[in-house]
């Protein structure tokens, strides 16, 4: 029998509380009623949904590859090929997620994970990090050298996914659209081309373990990390839309490439051969070279997009010190400015810092440690002294550990200064 329009609803349609139990706090409309407590639950659910990061949904407009590269240009010096390749790969990856459903296209678009090959300190990690920040997606870094095959002492590959979940503040659906950078991937190469009698638990075994999560699977991740236990609850995460970027130095890979190219051109004139002189042989990288190096074919197949990074020269390191928006020199300048102290560098000092990084063969990564060591005593003194107004890093202080940067108690620097000074431009002030 239908309820008459005038008939009053006596209880909450959701929880069943009567008007008396709800202390009269019930709102009704037509044939439905809701109590105050249930309305609060609904309000909180809607609020949680609206508070979710915008990246959980399709963005209004994906940055184009040119826009992504332009963003990378602000932070990374050189490495043009890697910046272009990564910009296209990231654009295509998220275009595939937000616009390329099989229902709409009739075609299932497979994801294209990326492999970056280049020396230590050439910018592999920074490229991935800056792209993730620009896309506003969670980002995690993993070290392949800590991973071992399941059942052995070490870290399970699923722990990589836990780092991404943490980066997404526990939001699994947000993490499922993130980016993972696996560093030192060359360190899990097989020990040799032939399978060893002994178990290679940190080489081929890890590659086999990584295959599924890189390709796309539902992985069960222990919430506290470590090894999985039979009765422990796990977090299920779909890796189908997670972009994996793997990087490594691959020492010796250039020789493999050169041997292959030379073998291919036996019998041809030297003028018809590819020029592999200098450090450019990595641009001719092919799958067979990676397999020869020690990566298994199945693993190489999951990383179809390749790019190379050049070894940084002294002139590149000089630019890295001062040119990017968040250059190392600019960071230290602002750090000193927080204590009301001006930081200046002799141009010869910047040259000496770049030269030292070259000698240590640490690339851009070594620049910060050189500056930290150089300025540590000054940074120790500044917070306790109101007299220090200006610090000048000289060439002598870089080259000689017994010479400290010059400390001035007044803002004025005598002119002409014996050495040319580099001063942070007004853009960074």
Swiss-Prot record:
Any Gene Ontology biological process: proteolysis involved in protein catabolic process
Which of this chain's residues are annotated to bind Zn(2+)?
A: 12, 15, 35, 38
GO terms of molecular function: ATP binding; ATP hydrolysis activity; ATP-dependent protein folding chaperone; protein dimerization activity; unfolded protein binding; zinc ion binding
UniProt-listed Gene3D superfamilies: 1.10.8.60, ClpX chaperone, C4-type zinc finger domain, P-loop containing nucleotide triphosphate hydrolases
ClpX-type ZB domain: from which residue to which, for each copy?
1-54
Positions of ATP binding: 119-126
One GO CC annotation: HslUV protease complex
Which keywords are on file for this protein? ATP-binding, Chaperone, Metal-binding, Nucleotide-binding, Zinc
On the tree of life, the source organism's domain of life is Bacteria
| Entry-linked CDD domains | RecA-like_ClpX (cd19497)
User: Which family, according to UniProt?
Assistant: Belongs to the ClpX chaperone family.
Role: ATP-dependent specificity component of the Clp protease. It directs the protease to specific substrates. Can perform chaperone functions in the absence of ClpP.
How is the quaternary structure described?
Component of the ClpX-ClpP complex. Forms a hexameric ring that, in the presence of ATP, binds to fourteen ClpP subunits assembled into a disk-like structure with a central cavity, resembling the structure of eukaryotic proteasomes.
Protein's name according to its UniProt entry: ATP-dependent Clp protease ATP-binding subunit ClpX
